[in-house]
């Protein structure tokens, strides 16, 4: 299948790389080639400095004090919420809930909406490509409520076909939970079309944007999803911060996932009433500095240019497809049109862990294992693969280094 590389204009990747201090280090005496962005991305100096400044100059708990530091921290925290709102083009900051991760965000919907709304025989449609974080919470509902999971397939190229998805929908379908972009294959799912079809049938849709939000602009109003989740550490921000976007009506339907401070309106000896969203879903002290750091990470992505990032990564993906095809005995899993910058692969006869360890000695960081996507790997008949995932700072020279190291690994185990 031909995938011509799109032209990339005015993208200075070397200037971008200088913003990430860790990229200047060496590993085993070799320059670091970091290709594990699908697991977690590196942080620009802006984010590192922001986190240090917040702890050094304006740290206090938020929404709980009238003193100077509390007001400063609250203002910075809520400014981060506004930055997330703009990043997703959400209608209001009240649609933006801070969590600790995408995983917690999905569980918030599963427990807050799925548990009270779904019952015996109701169906939840997910795809075979889902990360375990978008599988296991729905299994909880299957086990406790008697709901059923229905799996939308992919073809042998890892492509997602809308006509196959529609066949999964029945009068018992009560929820759709779907990835925006596969973390193992890079397949991009037509979530806007899915939401259009779902809307006609009155089915709510959760989109897992843990990968999608990193690699393409996202407009939740245009997609028209009911919920959208993403995680900060993949967006070049700190770990420990995630985001749940929810439509106003859906958030008001949901019961709180956790109880504690801030999420209440009133507590008495015999009853409790809950705060309005988003605070209803932010029990306890939130990830304050992590949220502030995420806001500045999104600022950084906007500065570089989200369309420019997408074009750079598309060009890199096309080049990687070409270079990896030159490695003898290497099989790439997933070649869907328009795929994102993720490559899962194996070298015939060599375990993924062994390949990863050998190329690590060349300074190259990839992931080896199941990528928290065991049903997908089973569908392709493998138990583990290596995964190279590219970000806004990766280069063609690093793709060359990967291809050369893989050829060396193949010969090493021959």
Task: Give the positions of each predicted feature.
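Pyridoxal 5′-phosphate
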Residues: 1-414
């Amino acid at each position: 299948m031909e995938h011509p590389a799109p032209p990339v204009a005015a993208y200075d990747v070397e200037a971008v790389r200088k913003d990430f201090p860790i990229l200047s280090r060496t590993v085993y005496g070799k320059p670091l080639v970091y290709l594990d962005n699908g697991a977690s991305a590196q942080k620009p100096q802006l984010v590192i400095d922001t986190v240090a400044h917040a702890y050094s100059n304006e740290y206090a708990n938020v929404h709980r004090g009238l003193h100077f530091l509390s007001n400063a921290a609250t203002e910075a925290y809520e400014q981060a919420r506004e930055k997330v709102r703009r990043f997703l083009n959400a209608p209001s900051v009240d649609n933006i809930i801070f969590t600790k991760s995408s995983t917690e965000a999905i569980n918030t919907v599963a427990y807050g909406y799925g548990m009270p709304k779904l019952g015996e025989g109701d169906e939840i449609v997910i795809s075979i490509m889902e990360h375990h974080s978008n599988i296991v919470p729905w299994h909880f509902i299957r086990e406790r409520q008697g709901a059923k999971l229905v799996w939308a397939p992919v073809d042998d190229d890892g492509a997602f076909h809308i006509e196959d998805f529609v066949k999964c929908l029945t009068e018992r379908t009560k929820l759709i939970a779907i990835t925006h972009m596969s973390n193992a294959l890079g397949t991009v799912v037509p979530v806007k079309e899915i939401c259009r079809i779902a809307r006609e049938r009155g089915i709510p849709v959760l989109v897992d944007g843990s990968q999608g939000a990193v690699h393409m602009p996202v407009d939740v109003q245009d997609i028209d999803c009911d919920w959208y989740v993403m995680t900060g550490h993949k967006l070049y921000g700190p770990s420990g911060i995630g985001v749940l976007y929810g439509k106003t009506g859906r958030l008001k339907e949901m019961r709180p996932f956790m109880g504690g401070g801030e999420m209440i309106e009133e507590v008495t000896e015999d009853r409790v009433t809950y705060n309005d969203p988003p605070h209803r879903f932010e029990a306890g002290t939130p990830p304050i500095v992590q949220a502030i750091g995420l806001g500045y990470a999104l600022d950084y992505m906007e500065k570089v240019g989200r369309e420019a990032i997408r074009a750079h990564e598309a060009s890199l993906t096309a080049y990687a497809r070409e270079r990896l095809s030159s490695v003898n005995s290497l099989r790439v899993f997933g070649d869907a049109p328009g795929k994102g910058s993720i490559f899962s692969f194996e070298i015939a006869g060599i375990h993924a862990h062994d390949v990863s360890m050998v190329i690590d000695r060349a300074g190259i960081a990839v992931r080896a294992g199941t990528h928290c996507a065991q049903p997908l790997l089973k569908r392709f008949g493998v138990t583990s693969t290596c995964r190279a995932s590219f970000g806004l700072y990766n280069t063609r020279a690093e793709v060359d280094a990967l291809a050369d190291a893989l050829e060396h690994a193949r010969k090493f185990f021959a």
